[in-house]
């Protein structure tokens, strides 16, 4: 009996092609979010602009929020990183300055949109914290703890409370649209918050 022939298994896409598709998708998300809100963005629009199939999107990112967060972490996060040789206070000032610059730029609208969506969607709120807020909060607290251990900050300083006092004020002004929201505001905020904690 003649054996039934089966089609050969399809090979995976070349890494270069996958990288090109990934870059096109990230570009599409960024561009579309300059024109509309996170809420109004659709996976169909992203797929069409990036010239990829919807199954490709859903294979890599199961939800719209995960896709937007991926773009945010890839495109915005590198601008927030800081050198490791700074003092705790200098590191804090740099983090504050870069975050304010980012929020005043095109990424600010995207972050605000994700936070707004997270108020009614627990999964979005949790993902935003896990991928965006949490790692940066932990890194800053670690910097402040390092400064405390090195004697830069007083021994009774609570790094987590100091961090939240500073960045809580930044998010407060950012989300409510309060002025001024400038580098100078950031410098004055850090000075007021850290003045009583210097050793």
Write out the residue ranges for each language-model feature.
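Amphipathic alpha-helical segments enriched in hydrophobic/aromatic and basic residues
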Residues: 33-36, 42-43, 54, 64-72, ...
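Helix-loop "lid/cap" segments that line or gate small-molecule binding pockets
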Residues: 97-103, 111-120, 190-197
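Hydrophobic alpha-helical connector segments
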Residues: 80-109
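Hydrophobic/aromatic-rich alpha-helical bundle segments in the mid-to-C-terminal region
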Residues: 2, 126, 130, 134, ...
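Amphipathic alpha-helical packing segments from all-alpha helical-bundle domains
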Residues: 101-109, 113, 123-150, 160
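Short hydrophobic/aromatic patch on the recognition helix
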Residues: 51-61
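Short, basic, alpha-helical segments at the C-terminal edge of helix-turn-helix-like DNA-binding modules
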Residues: 72-78
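Basic, helix-initiating cap at the start of DNA-binding domains
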Residues: 1-49, 66
